Amino acid sequence: MPQADFYILPSADEDSRYQFLGKLATRAISAGHWLYIHTDSEHLAERISERLWQSSPESFLANSLPTEKLHAPILIGWQPDHIPNTPDMLVNLSTIFPSQTVEFSRIAEIVIQSDEILALTRGRFKEYQGAGIQPRMHDMRKRSS
């Protein structure tokens, strides 16, 4: 059964979501995970890719898009057929619950304080429960930066 974690951020802006993604990806890669980040569009995937390559002044997070030949520990896709054949960890930044979600061993949802994102998150939380997955909540609003 997959482990699903919802990270509730204190901010409403997308930038904080991408900053947290960089931290989460760094920890996951250090722990030996291969990440698949699912987005809603190619444009958003490219934007996230750029952010990860420039994640911090002293490091970068190697990643690739399905349209590239590069084999990196982070794959960023936007269509169901982009999901890897050997799924490990999913970071779902899309507005949907991909049907292959239950095939991953770890799942992360990064939630910002936007009305649209919060409404989608409530729906996805129920979808996880419907799939037999009991999500864990991590309220980052209660932690200092």
What are these regions (language model features)?
Residues 1-44:
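Long, hydrophobic N-terminal alpha-helical segment
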Residues 49-86:
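Helix-adjacent hinge/juxtasegments
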Residues 80, 84-96, 104-108, 112-125:
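Conserved RecA-like P-loop NTPase helicase motor core
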Residues 36, 76, 90-91:
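Structural motif
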Residues 7, 91, 108, 136-138:
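Hydrophobic/aromatic beta-strand patches that form the interior of the parallel beta-sheet core
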Residues 24, 52-55, 107, 124-127:
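Short, solvent-exposed amphipathic alpha-helical segments in soluble enzyme
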Residues 121-145:
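Well-ordered alpha/beta subsegment
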Residues 43-47, 117-118:
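Short, charged/polar "capping" segments at the starts of alpha-helices
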